[in-house]
Amino acid sequence: YFYFEKVKRFGDVPWYDQPLKSDNPDLYKARDSREFVMSKILEDIDYAIAKLPQEQNVYSVTQWTALALKSRICLFEGTFRKYHGIAGHEEYLDECIKAAERFIDESPYLIYKGSSTPYRDLFSSNNAISTEVILARDYEIGLNIIHNANNYTLSNTYGMPGLNKKIVDS
């Protein structure tokens, strides 16, 4: 996922497949091609799909989580290549379809229809609804495992007074 985000943002990036020490000259190597990095990403995700457990666990990465991620990665890369005139988009879109079809056909996930307000239940439940949610985080205030959703709804000053430029310059 780390490299996928880097490719989305920067395109060509250097690929490292082993830990490096701070004095390693490879830290300054040139960027690897997008094609090379994306092939390595798919190689890694295919390895994960083969090795991860199949059991459904909403709070842990499983084979189903990796398949969903592969579908998403391939959809992004395939459409990016198609609409930017880069060759090879068909292969990525085909891989996206294969991963999505396998997920739909073989995974234990279903659309949640457990109440009269299923959409609300997905987002207001204290625990993730394991029949539909693929991966979630279990927040527990007692263990100080919390989210930062308030950062998206509050101002940058978090309710404290903010200083304007005139006050700062005075």
Predicted regions and their residues:
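An aromatic- and glycine-enriched ligand-binding surface/loop that stacks and positions planar moieties
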Residues: V13, Y47, S60, W64-L67, ...
